[in-house]
Amino acid sequence: MWKEIDKTKGPIYRQMMDQIMKNIENGNLAPGERLPSERKLAAAFRTNRTTVVRALDELRDLGVLTSRQGSGRYVNQTEWGKFSVPRINWRELFSQRYEQVDDWYEERIKEAKKQPDFLDLFSSEMPNKLLPDVQFPAHTMAEMITEEQKMTDLGYLPLVEKIEGYLSDEFQFDFSRTQLLVTVGGQQAIFLILQTLLSNGDAVAVESPSFFYRLALFRATGTRLFGIPMDDEGIDLAILEKSIQKNKIKAVLVNPNFQNPTGKVMSQKRRNDLVVLCRKYQVPIVEDDVFSDLSFQEVEKSPVSIHSLDPENVLYVGSLSRLLGKTTKIGWIIGPQTLIFKLAKAQKMMEFSMSIFTQIAATAVFEESYDAKLALVRNQLQEKSLLLQKWAQKQNFFNVWPIKGGYYAWVTWEGKKMTAEIASEAVAKGLGVAPSWLFGRETNGIRINFSRLDQDRMIVFAKRMEELAGWLQA
């Protein structure tokens, strides 16, 4: 059962952890079974008891083992024995509220936007003229009172039904209505999850760079973020596993479709492997999927959602806010029914429940012509992306990551980094972009919102990017 440790292959205690985990997964150690004594394990691994204790303590902190005073260490029967695959022990914690905190750079952007010739490629919304033309229903007060009777703790029932039908038809989702909670946008959904899942000071792994670093809600909940680099297929799982072991990661947040800010799409294999890794360590996944509606390719050719691979251990966050503008915040969470009820309770306690007016308006979005309107938006975005990629093909300095959907493009270069001084100078000269250091990583990259470009603005964009290239090469 136990193999001698190879001291040349990394920390001894981590190799011990891996062997114990594999024996649990293979069934050599059953749920509730007592492990050999520390002395016997030290002899089996040919190491000292101090190293054994460290490995066992780490596994206890991860929830894999339990300790009984005077009796030894046991495989966690609650987590590993009750279900065929380990399910997450979701916990309730309802505390702080979320308040947005603006930084100095965003304040400069706000001031610069008052100038008529300012090219705003920083903002996170599409321009109003691209938003679908939705006709909202007119209701009398008596009708509103009648509709209000259809409100549940999970949301306005007709809206819940529409979202369920849409996700089932478009993305082949399979879930019951009691597994969906309507929220005030995607950010509130994430906030509720953090409040229910984590304790103050807990660690969360995110992709790096990531827009999650821009959200003040992590500060509000006392969450510590650990950035995990990405390669062409998505989040680096080898580095993620080391971070789970070292930093006691309690949740993994990913943005797998048209990742913000890079626009990358996580490969199907990487999604499968991510689920396996997080099952191994009993770490829940939060899948933030607010851009999947804006794919430039057919759904059949896109990777399946991470949630569909492991519905019990993955929480899925979706949103209509990108398509309705910042004034109409609509989002949802899909997950295990017991957790959804707890999230609904938290939402109610914190008075975050949505008004009936907003939910009726959102329900109107899912009319029969919605698919056609959404297709029009996608076509317009794809045309704009082609303008940008055509510009990129002529570049010797800037590179643009391939654009497959969404409305963000990630522009990189070799050489000098985008300092705060250069970014400020660009704003002063009429160009607003989002530098990589806003997303938790100081790399040579900027995010641009290409939905705000057109033929005329591309000319201005090309000129100002040429000026930026000069500053970066100076």
Which stretches of residues belong to each language-model region?
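Conserved glycine-rich beta-strand-loop-beta hairpin in the small C-terminal domain of fold type I
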Residues: T363, N379-Q389, N399-T412
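Conserved PLP-binding active-site segment of the aspartate aminotransferase-like
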Residues: G335, W410-G415, G432-W471
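Conserved active-site segment immediately N-terminal to the catalytic lysine
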Residues: E300-L320, F341-A344, I446
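Short beta-strand "wing" residues that participate in macromolecule-binding interfaces
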Residues: S67-R68, F175, V433-P435
